[in-house]
């Protein structure tokens, strides 16, 4: 594993959330704007690393990490990349719902998750679980992570591989085995400690 960027400081998930709050409340940067910045970063790094995929499959959960994934989908569609979003939840956070609407306006294809789903080409983006994951992996998230890992395709994690604890780097059950992790705001402790380095692949901030 290699790191494209070595950080002088590592941040806890709580610290990163506080920096995010400051950006939104004190600097008055709308959350959706931050999501669009994050999504643009993910797509840029993905294309620079792997080139345009024949198919981009983005797995989305329910929170703001999913929102980033919906933005990636919309931006990819705007570049005429074939893209599908695999959805694990219809109960989205407010910001994730806004991001989904943005993807829908870009005519992104939404596919409900099914454990029998087969993805045989392209690149997979993991936008299931963010830094709020603390080690209690609900289904069908475990099934989705296993399906992602078993695909044999290049895997890109949004902010942090799903299933990895952002503070400790601990994997309680299963985590996405990413080839590339594009993280935001600050380098999370768990990316560089514990089992984190074995699951993150190259890390871009």
Where does each model-flagged region fall?
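Residue-level detector of flexible, active-site-proximal loop/helix-junction positions
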Residues: 23, 90, 115-117, 162, ...
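Conserved active-site and cofactor/substrate-binding residues in soluble primary-metabolism enzymes
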Residues: 11-14, 29-41, 67, 94, ...
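Unusually extended, aromatic-enriched hydrophobic runs near protein termini
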Residues: 25-26, 81-84, 202
């Amino acid at each position: 594993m290699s790191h494209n960027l070595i950080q002088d400081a590592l941040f806890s998930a709580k610290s990163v959330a506080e920096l995010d709050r400051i950006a939104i409340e004190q600097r008055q940067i709308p959350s959706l704007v931050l999501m669009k910045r994050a999504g643009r970063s993910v797509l840029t790094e993905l294309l620079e690393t792997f080139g345009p995929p024949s198919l981009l499959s983005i797995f989305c959960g329910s929170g703001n990490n999913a929102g980033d994934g919906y933005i990636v989908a919309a931006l990819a569609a705007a570049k005429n990349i074939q893209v599908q979003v695999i959805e694990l939840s219809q109960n989205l956070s407010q910001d994730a719902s806004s991001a989904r609407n943005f993807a829908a306006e870009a005519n992104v294809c939404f596919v409900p998750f099914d454990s029998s789903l087969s993805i045989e080409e392209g690149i997979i983006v993991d936008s299931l679980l963010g830094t709020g994951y603390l080690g209690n992996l609900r289904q069908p998230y475990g099934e989705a992570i296993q399906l992602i890992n078993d695909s044999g395709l290049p895997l890109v994690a949004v902010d942090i591989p799903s299933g990895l604890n952002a503070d400790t780097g601990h994997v309680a059950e299963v985590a996405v085995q990413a080839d590339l992790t594009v993280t935001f705001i600050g380098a999370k402790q768990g990316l560089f400690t514990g089992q984190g380095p074995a699951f993150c692949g190259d890390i871009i901030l």
